[in-house]
């Protein structure tokens, strides 16, 4: 074990202070009755438009796709589910558009997005005798883009979709520069390369697509107006929630009591807004934002401040989860311990009215598990910076990534019925949760491990893999990027071929968590360094309204 003098050396990370402070305290605008009435009127018009569109027609497919990408599909869940089910049921029959690459690809993507397994054999008609996609397709930019987006719904060993991704990427890259700048298709291709639809955060995607869709001469004027009104109305709700959370955070005064930790309340709210943005999840969003802000604080305390002598009793107290354990906690951490217990007690009280307070057991279970994983990493560091075997580190890192905790806890505050069996399934680490956790850990380590090694910090998965397998840093990057790709395919598989039947909205929460990590850790750690791209995303979703 390391000496006690080494224990007293704090591995400070020097995180930058909050970008937002208490900026959102004043955002308390109410949604007016006039706004509600106007949105409802448009909604009924759009609903009628959707219902009356011929079943399985290109018109209906295009309308559903636009609704989803503009962020208004949640108003029409039942109608869309019925339409997609009918399209899927009829998919074995000959269709007039079966030789249209754009339509076949769009239909395939919409059906798979809805959780139905449509065979990728539908693309065989576009393959030549050499097993390659026909060169005659290269002039159909819209069709190529549609196929490119569809290829991201693939599962493992779907060679035709692997080939589709390679083929469309090559030809779209060579074509996009020839499209005029005012061409909405060019903007769509550019955005697809940056973030394919399958990996796009719904709210971020909606905000961007509103602008792209508006520049498309074929856009539906009513749908566009509805999307803008709905976006602005939802934004007011989100601002109000963030105002309430900011008041809670200000009262806790963590920024002053714990200046070593990342002060990222607004960023945490954005994270959870990525998981669910719909009005019915308002309570769940506020609960979950508090939880991940605490998880972020614990991460920094274990990783970037506390000594091992302080962490041991702190971890023990969290495992006990009992106010009577507070005296064993290091004095400066008692405020945080009390805050943790209060958050979960408030959750229990709120849910007791609906006879759902038993859900909080699973939230506590996962938080304890997360803290144990943080503590395990601290033990390795304390043991003369012991570098564990890659497989051992991987098992722990899958937990310390935080997504197992997040995937379970985000279900606690929702209004939908969730069975005990679903919660038990979730805490037993099903494939979709492990895949999401692996993506989170791999992407975090790829962009962050070198910065972390500049201070006293345990080895990341990258270092462990390099040491155990005798490979270079670049070879390790390739390995982990492959793991990320495989993780996405495993997530897709759980939607189409789940081992256990669970509600689709549960799977969607895990998918959205993964989309958040893909957005914030694609090029660098935007959460830790939140002054640039992340700040601009927050402005576009939570500060600036859409011009009607």
From Swiss-Prot:
The keyword Protein biosynthesis does not apply. Mg(2+) 2 binds at residues 299, 303. Its cofactor is Mg(2+); Mn(2+). Pathway: Secondary metabolite biosynthesis; terpenoid biosynthesis. Keywords: Lyase, Magnesium, Metal-binding. Binds 3 Mg(2+) or Mn(2+) ions per subunit. GO terms for molecular function: magnesium ion binding; terpene synthase activity. Mg(2+) 3 binds at residues 444, 452. The keyword Lyase applies. It is an enzyme of class 4 (lyase). Coiled coil: none annotated. Mg(2+) 1 binds at residues 299, 303. Sesquiterpene synthase involved in the biosynthesis of volatile compounds. Mediates the conversion of (2E,6E)-farnesyl diphosphate (FPP) into (1E,4E,8E)-alpha-humulene and (-)-(E)-beta-caryophyllene, and of (2Z,6Z)-farnesyl diphosphate ((ZZ)-FPP) into beta-bisabolene, gamma-curcumene and (Z)-gamma-bisabolene. Can act with a low efficiency as a monoterpene synthase with geranyl diphosphate (GPP) as substrate, thus producing beta-myrcene, (E)-beta-ocimene, limonene and terpinolene. This is Sesquiterpene synthase 12.
